[in-house]
Amino acid sequence: MNDKTVEFTVGTNIYKLQLKTKQCILLEKKLGQSPLEMLMKLEDGGLPTLNDMITIIAIGMLVHNPSMNENRVADLLDEYVEDGHSYMELLEVIVELLSKSGYINQEL
């Protein structure tokens, strides 16, 4: 079976992200749309809001870090950017997470 997790490194901490069915349903409710719709907007040059990216990462952390919430993820993203990363790099993590969760083919 393929590994369905994505590693998200912040400082010296490595977080495992994974979206199972329950997390996908929660994500759709929180975003008010399917993440697939968000990905289609990317193809048209649109970008997700920072709030949407935080929501995706927070929900992606729930399987392996059940106490994670959006406020804690916002703090992690501050550290992520301070470490020299960009929100575009974060978007790559999100696309990989959505790919491994089955929203898009992994070959894309």
Feature locations, PLM:
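Charged interaction scaffolds used for protein-protein
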Residues: M1-I14, Q33-G45, N65-L108
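Short, well-structured alpha-helical interface segments that form or flank functional binding sites
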Residues: D3, K22, P48, D52
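Short capping micro-motif at the N-terminus of alpha-helices
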Residues: L17-L19
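Short, surface-exposed, low-complexity cationic segments
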Residues: T21-M38
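A short, charged
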Residues: M40-I56, G60
